[in-house]
């Protein structure tokens, strides 16, 4: 049994109807793996940065009717939460695993953090071909950076600056049958490599 890797059974959790049923499946099937990833990558980030990180598993506590379409573990330097700070996420939808770093619209000093991305604009454009951006964390769509023009990428950062609900993340995704999900070793190696790239934008 895999400790870290998401399996086909895990992805099928998002087919369970109803809030109560899906939350029960998330808690039993996915959250133990999110907890294991949380422990492993908290240690990883604490080793690779001068700061102390904490893992936050999504609780979906505000939901009263609609079941969640995704779930995740987030990493931030605040023990009580992550939305107000730049943070890392590992999570999954029905047909996507995502790893990302950036800021939500709730972030304090959001513009400062967006400016960090802008200062590293050339590095964003030169990331490996499978890196993406996410401008709305509740949507699965994450366009590949290589498919965006320089102007389109600058516009995404500009919108994150100017719009109250603006957000910006650098992301990487896997399909459920990706070879990186075949073993815990392969998945951890993929995630470590991704975090190494994302840490370029952590400041």
Curated annotation (Swiss-Prot):
Signal peptide: none annotated. Belongs to the UPF0637 family. HAMAP family: UPF0637. This is UPF0637 protein Sca_0732.
